[in-house]
């Protein structure tokens, strides 16, 4: 009889826990093909994963703690679904736990990863997270990450909310390796206001180098971004501006050697980046996107303009086809690439057919097009 009572009690406890908790498995798979010219060595066809957006899978869940408060968690992993390999650590995109309440907001801590506040910049770009877009002319600066982090987001008041982050990473006196490596401390704040015809956001964030300085404008810098959208029927218009600043940047800190760049060119400490575009929902299934981006860097690094045109076609609620074409024009001392390639000369070796990065030669252009399919679950 005691065994029966104990068993019934355990079942009741499990049922109650199940009623108060939820766990969701989610993810998406993005595979396709691409062609690009103007790259070191000429041109290339290649299979590609993540050209519209990264492939990932994850788990997220919550437990009702009463009084409107819930405990929440998220674990998320990025994959290259062309070869099945992990991109980085197992849960490099997200590994967080926290609490949420509709009256007090949301707090979480852990590996914020791809939730670093600068990544919200995609909300100001009609190309969203595609290969050719808002990250191209800032060499990936908008895709920063944050570990050992804390985040708080306010409730939404009449369409307005704020979000702040502070990530210790490897650069504080009480959270450091013997020899700091990689990225240092990050912190940022964002304000978003949504209204009837669109939204507007401002994002300020800092990403420091391992020594705590701003020594690389495309990786370890201050960023101020403002942008938004306006909706007129089936057309969404997008526009934005971003300023990057890294006062401690030198040729040595960005990894370039003397004489490897055009005369008069040295590591930039400032970049101005602006863009505008639109997304047109042609039909229930079809959308067309277009955008123009322009960036200018100081210290003789010149400027570049990127033109993009894309389209999507929904096969179902969870599966769609996509394509995007891009063309980038560089001034004589600029060598920005279609995708967020590293700063510096490509150092192409025609004998071994190898290069330091995917940048074109200085003053040269790049063209590319890709297509693929994405499924979400």
Task: Describe the residue ranges of each PLM region.
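Structural signature of outer-membrane beta-barrel channels/translocons
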Residues: 60-64, 100-102, 153-156, 192-196, ...
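N-terminal signal peptide c-region/cleavage motif recognized by signal peptidases
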Residues: 14-16
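Gram-negative outer-membrane beta-barrel proteins
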Residues: 33-41, 79-83, 115-117, 170-174, ...
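Residues that define the transmembrane beta-barrel architecture of outer-membrane proteins
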Residues: 45-55, 91-93, 144-148, 183-187, ...
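Outer-membrane beta-barrel "beta-signal"
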Residues: 315, 361-377
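Outer membrane beta-barrel
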Residues: 21-35, 45-171, 183, 192-196, ...
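Detector for outer-membrane/organellar transmembrane beta-barrel domains
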Residues: 188-313, 324-327, 364
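Extracellular loop and loop/strand-boundary signature of outer-membrane beta-barrel proteins
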Residues: 42-46, 136-138, 174-177, 212-214, ...
């Amino acid at each position: 009889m005691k065994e029966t009572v104990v068993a019934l009690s355990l079942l009741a406890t499990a049922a109650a826990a199940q009623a108060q908790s939820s766990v969701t498995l989610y993810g998406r798979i993005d595979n396709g093909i691409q062609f690009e010219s103007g790259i070191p060595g000429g041109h290339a066809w290649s299979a590609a994963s993540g050209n519209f957006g990264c492939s990932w899978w994850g788990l997220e869940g919550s437990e009702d703690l009463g009084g409107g408060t819930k405990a929440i968690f998220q674990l998320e992993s990025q994959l290259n679904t062309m070869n099945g390999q992990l991109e980085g650590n197992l849960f490099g995109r997200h590994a967080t736990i926290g609490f949420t309440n509709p009256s007090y907001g949301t707090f979480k801590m852990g590996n914020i990863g791809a939730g670093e506040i600068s990544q919200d910049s995609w909300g100001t770009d009609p190309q969203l997270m595609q290969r050719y877009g808002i990250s191209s002319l800032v060499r990936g600066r908008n895709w920063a990450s944050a570990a050992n982090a804390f985040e708080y987001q306010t409730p939404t008041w009449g369409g307005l909310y704020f979000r702040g982050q502070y990530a210790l990473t490897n650069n504080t006196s009480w959270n450091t390796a013997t020899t700091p490596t990689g990225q240092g401390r990050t912190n940022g704040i964002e304000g978003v206001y949504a209204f009837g015809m669109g939204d507007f956001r401002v994002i300020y964030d800092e990403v420091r180098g391992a020594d705590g300085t701003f020594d690389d404008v495309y990786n370890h810098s201050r960023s101020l971004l403002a942008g938004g959208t306006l909706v007129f029927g089936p057309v969404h218009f997008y526009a934005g501006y971003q300023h990057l600043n890294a006062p401690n940047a030198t040729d040595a800190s960005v990894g370039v050697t003397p004489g490897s760049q055009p005369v008069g060119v040295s590591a930039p400490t400032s970049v101005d980046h602006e863009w505008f575009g639109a997304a047109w929902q042609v039909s229930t299934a079809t959308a067309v996107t277009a955008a123009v981006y322009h960036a200018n860097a100081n210290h003789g690094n010149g400027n570049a303009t990127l033109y993009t045109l894309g389209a999507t076609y929904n096969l179902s609620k969870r599966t769609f086809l996509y394509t995007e074409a891009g063309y980038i024009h560089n001034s004589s001392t600029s060598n920005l690439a279609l995708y967020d390639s590293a700063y510096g000369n490509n150092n192409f070796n025609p004998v071994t057919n190898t290069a330091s990065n995917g940048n074109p030669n200085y003053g040269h252009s790049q063209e590319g097009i890709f297509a693929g399919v994405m499924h979400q679950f």
